[in-house]
């Protein structure tokens, strides 16, 4: 007999995931991980005590942000795939069905296991051909943040989205209790404007940068209560390194894909770099309420639909050229003469299925952000972790124009 113990509906919404988790959290020996804009993989228990997970790899439609959908290759219909959560010591039995048009295998990145379960096509196993189902089985002897991803035609399969987290909680946890635990995949894509299929052949010139395969303003915020101890796990199987910066707080890097970092070797940071093939886990106490920016600090990564090899027109008067171009392209709008902030306010129609360069709005206006950007929302006295709305700043704590102050003084 197979017994369903724990799982969540595969809904790409952090809020639906939160409500499902609330019903099961009391019976768990750990704080469940939240995968913003993602989900956690259900499992069943076999008679021998093995936790059974089922993965189908195939094609899917994936929303990067409102207004942009891509043709992705996915695990269980989503990218990143559902997060697998286990406890150190668990016996895992994972069935993988291939619905792709080519062979594949699944590698359990950073996990110590028998060589034949490592998941490398041709080297440690035969390729899982289209229509076939393979079984992986191993005991989880570690705890920490790990990843699973394709290991056959990596360029195409991972380039189109086949990756996910495998998180192993310690059997005997030590240290302070974690109140909120998040997992975020860092990735980059090249999608030709006006098209839907990412080009996996691109090596460096990416134009879409994502947290969990979503670009701002499509990224879910991280909602926490004031005083919560927060853990954020980052994973990267892309091409680029990403320095992720948190406003308002310092954190400590507590573990890597290689294991825990002893407290004596930890130091405070406000930016953590995760290189390709690595995971990094940070912890901090969210003790100051507000809406705090959380983003990649490479200048082009918190933007969307980035172009390459464009002419530098800073300081160039484009009025004459603009009029001539409009004769050929009605509605053409010149840009870049005074910087790119004007993109926040322009309503220039772009190619179909293409995000604006900077499309996010805050309570005070355009943010000038896109791509790898989200918000840590810290609030006092939250009843739940639903979106709390804009932060109500106390009077006198928001920067403002001194011209307005002068006008008030004159009156």
Residue ranges and their predicted role:
Residues 1-411:
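Copper-binding active sites and cupredoxin-like electron-transfer domains
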């Amino acid at each position: 007999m197979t017994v369903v113990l724990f799982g969540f509906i595969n809904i790409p919404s952090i809020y639906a995931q939160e409500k499902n988790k609330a019903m099961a959290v009391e019976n768990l020996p750990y704080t469940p991980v939240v995968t913003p804009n993602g989900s956690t993989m259900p499992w069943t228990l076999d008679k021998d005590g093995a936790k059974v997970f089922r993965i189908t790899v195939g094609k899917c439609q994936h929303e990067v942000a409102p207004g942009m959908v891509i043709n992705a290759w996915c695990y269980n219909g989503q990218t990143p795939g559902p997060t697998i959560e286990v406890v150190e010591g668990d016996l895992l039995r994972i069935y993988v069905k291939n619905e792709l048009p080519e062979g594949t295998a699944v590698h359990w990145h950073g996990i110590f296991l028998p060589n034949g379960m490592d998941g490398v096509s041709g080297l440690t196993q035969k390729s899982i051909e289209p229509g076939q189902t393979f079984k992986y089985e191993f005991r989880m002897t570690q705890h920490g943040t790990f990843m699973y991803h394709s290991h056959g035609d990596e360029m195409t399969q991972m380039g189109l989205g086949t990756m996910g987290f495998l998180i192993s909680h310690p059997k005997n946890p030590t240290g302070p209790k974690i109140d909120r635990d998040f997992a975020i995949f860092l990735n980059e894509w090249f999608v030709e404007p006006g098209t839907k299929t990412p080009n996996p052949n691109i090596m460096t010139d990416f134009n879409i940068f994502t947290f969990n395969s979503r670009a701002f303003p499509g990224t879910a915020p991280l909602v926490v209560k004031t005083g919560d101890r927060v853990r954020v796990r980052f994973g990267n199987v892309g091409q680029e390194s990403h320095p992720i910066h948190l406003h308002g707080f310092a954190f400590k890097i507590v573990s890597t894909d290689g294991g825990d970092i002893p407290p004596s070797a930890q130091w405070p940071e406000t930016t953590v770099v995760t290189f390709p093939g690595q995971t990094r886990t940070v912890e901090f106490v969210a003790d100051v309420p507000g809406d705090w920016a959380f983003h990649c600090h490479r200048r082009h990564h918190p933007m969307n639909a980035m172009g390459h090899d464009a002419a530098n027109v800073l300081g160039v008067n484009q009025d004459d050229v603009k009029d001539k171009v409009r004769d050929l392209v009605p509605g053409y709008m010149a840009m870049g003469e005074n910087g790119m902030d004007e993109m926040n306010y322009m309503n220039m129609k772009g190619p179909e299925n293409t995000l604006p360069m900077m499309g996010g709005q805050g309570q005070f206006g355009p943010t000038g952000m896109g791509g790898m950007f989200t918000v840590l929302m810290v609030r006092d006295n939250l009843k739940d972790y639903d979106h709390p709305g804009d932060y109500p700043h106390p009077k006198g704590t928001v920067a403002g124009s001194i011209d307005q102050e002068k006008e008030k003084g004159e009156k």
